């Protein structure tokens, strides 16, 4: 895409239209990627049954959500028996025995957090990019890095307390009155900063991921357009650029993902047993403990499952988002012409 066309697109696509495009992309990404994680959780629960109070991470392709296992026998979706022999076998048996809707078990509650976070993130990124381009010039290579960092930092900061509250409601079955009491008590005892517990490892993972993702995405998209002799990227160019840049960022930030998951799980283990969280459980201490116990490779455990989840999620999200913006841009041009 040439600079002039890119500049026109930013001007002609309104923030509301960017929000609609990102919302559509978020929902579509969740619908396509969630079944992969549902099957993974069902297979894990079959091999290692989840007792009450046990934490597990559920992903809808946009965000990771910590869930706390409840009592309920075989009624709960992640505890249903299946006798699965593998991933494909699990897909077919879940559809045949439980209905195709079971592949999206647990999705609606997670969208309450994921969709607003994604809308904030993508809209802020585009708005910041447009602002920086107007100040620094169209070809400034640091723009995707700066915009990606600021947008992700803001989205994580806004959503972090809401995610803590959502998980507490899910694990303790609080009413809104009880939730208000819990939040008030927590703030009075530990201060407002306690609502952002778990924020640091999330920022350490998501902010570098965002910077690397957007920088590589813009570079790859431009390079593929030049190789194809195109001024504007096609759907497949956006899709490929998103998958490759997402995969690279996922590998580079995996150690922080491992730490974040472990810290979340430990937090709720302490919470469920009503034990005070040790003050020394910082991100760096957890990382050192992982290396001491499992070696340096322990920081890269779960690489393949993360890539299987991240690559398609990034590809679907960005290509849908760019397609939506292109659609709105054409509609805006037509309105100006008539």
Curated annotation (Swiss-Prot):
<dbReference type="GO" id="GO:0170036">
    <property type="term" value="P:import into the mitochondrion"/>
</dbReference>
<feature type="transmembrane region" description="Helical; Name=6">
    <location>
        <begin position="298"/>
        <end position="318"/>
    </location>
</feature>
<keyword id="KW-1133">Transmembrane helix</keyword>
<feature type="repeat" description="Solcar 1">
    <location>
        <begin position="13"/>
        <end position="131"/>
    </location>
</feature>
<protein>
    <recommendedName>
        <fullName>Mitochondrial glutathione transporter SLC25A40</fullName>
    </recommendedName>
</protein>
<feature type="transmembrane region" description="Helical; Name=4">
    <location>
        <begin position="199"/>
        <end position="220"/>
    </location>
</feature>
<dbReference type="InterPro" id="IPR002067">
    <property type="entry name" value="Mit_carrier"/>
</dbReference>
<keyword id="KW-0472">Membrane</keyword>
<dbReference type="GO" id="GO:0034634">
    <property type="term" value="F:glutathione transmembrane transporter activity"/>
</dbReference>
<dbReference type="InterPro" id="IPR023395">
    <property type="entry name" value="Mt_carrier_dom_sf"/>
</dbReference>
<keyword id="KW-0677">Repeat</keyword>
<comment type="function">
    <text>Probable mitochondrial transporter required for glutathione import into mitochondria. Glutathione, which plays key roles in oxidative metabolism, is produced exclusively in the cytosol and is imported in many organelles. Mitochondrial glutathione is required for the activity and stability of proteins containing iron-sulfur clusters, as well as erythropoiesis.</text>
</comment>
<dbReference type="GO" id="GO:0005739">
    <property type="term" value="C:mitochondrion"/>
</dbReference>
<feature type="transmembrane region" description="Helical; Name=1">
    <location>
        <begin position="19"/>
        <end position="39"/>
    </location>
</feature>
<keyword id="KW-0812">Transmembrane</keyword>
<dbReference type="InterPro" id="IPR045315">
    <property type="entry name" value="Mtm1-like"/>
</dbReference>
<keyword id="KW-0496">Mitochondrion</keyword>
<dbReference type="GO" id="GO:0048821">
    <property type="term" value="P:erythrocyte development"/>
</dbReference>
<dbReference type="InterPro" id="IPR018108">
    <property type="entry name" value="Mitochondrial_sb/sol_carrier"/>
</dbReference>
<feature type="repeat" description="Solcar 2">
    <location>
        <begin position="139"/>
        <end position="223"/>
    </location>
</feature>
<feature type="transmembrane region" description="Helical; Name=5">
    <location>
        <begin position="239"/>
        <end position="259"/>
    </location>
</feature>
<keyword id="KW-0999">Mitochondrion inner membrane</keyword>
<keyword id="KW-0813">Transport</keyword>
<feature type="repeat" description="Solcar 3">
    <location>
        <begin position="233"/>
        <end position="327"/>
    </location>
</feature>
<feature type="transmembrane region" description="Helical; Name=2">
    <location>
        <begin position="103"/>
        <end position="123"/>
    </location>
</feature>
<dbReference type="GO" id="GO:0005743">
    <property type="term" value="C:mitochondrial inner membrane"/>
</dbReference>
<dbReference type="Pfam" id="PF00153">
    <property type="entry name" value="Mito_carr"/>
</dbReference>
<feature type="transmembrane region" description="Helical; Name=3">
    <location>
        <begin position="142"/>
        <end position="162"/>
    </location>
</feature>
<comment type="similarity">
    <text>Belongs to the mitochondrial carrier (TC 2.A.29) family.</text>
</comment>
